[in-house]
């Protein structure tokens, strides 16, 4: 499973751990991803999405149908 939010497109970022002595070691900042099922009333079925917590807030704000429409448009453009 790729660590990418299907709504926002958030991906892991790279950076440094910085010690008290200012020594830097590489690390990854991972997005807070959750697998969630959402009910689609139009299609009368569930859909499972891998979304970040920020993506969940977007779904709460805009609605699952509007967000799913944007995801499907983005997938068509990439093909």
Swiss-Prot record:
Compositional bias segments (type: Polar residues): 11-20
Gene Ontology molecular function: structural constituent of ribosome
One cellular-component annotation, GO: cytosolic large ribosomal subunit
Entry-linked Pfam families: Ribosomal_L28
Alphabetical UniProt keywords: Ribonucleoprotein, Ribosomal protein
Record-level GO BP terms: translation
InterPro entries reported for this sequence: Ribosomal_bL28 (IPR026569), Ribosomal_bL28/bL31-like_sf (IPR034704), Ribosomal_bL28_bact-type (IPR001383), Ribosomal_bL28_sf (IPR037147)
Region (Disordered): 1-26
Family to which this protein belongs: Belongs to the bacterial ribosomal protein bL28 family.
Protein name, as recorded: Large ribosomal subunit protein bL28
Protein's organism: Coxiella burnetii (strain RSA 493 / Nine Mile phase I)
């Amino acid at each position: 499973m790729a660590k990418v939010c299907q709504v926002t497109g958030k991906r892991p970022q790279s950076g440094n751990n910085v010690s008290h002595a200012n020594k830097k070691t590489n690390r990854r900042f991972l997005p807070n991803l959750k697998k969630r099922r959402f009910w689609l009333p139009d299609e009368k079925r569930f859909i499972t999405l891998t979304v970040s917590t920020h993506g969940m807030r977007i779904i709460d704000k805009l609605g699952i149908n509007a967000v799913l429409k944007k995801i499907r448009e983005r997938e068509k453009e990439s093909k």
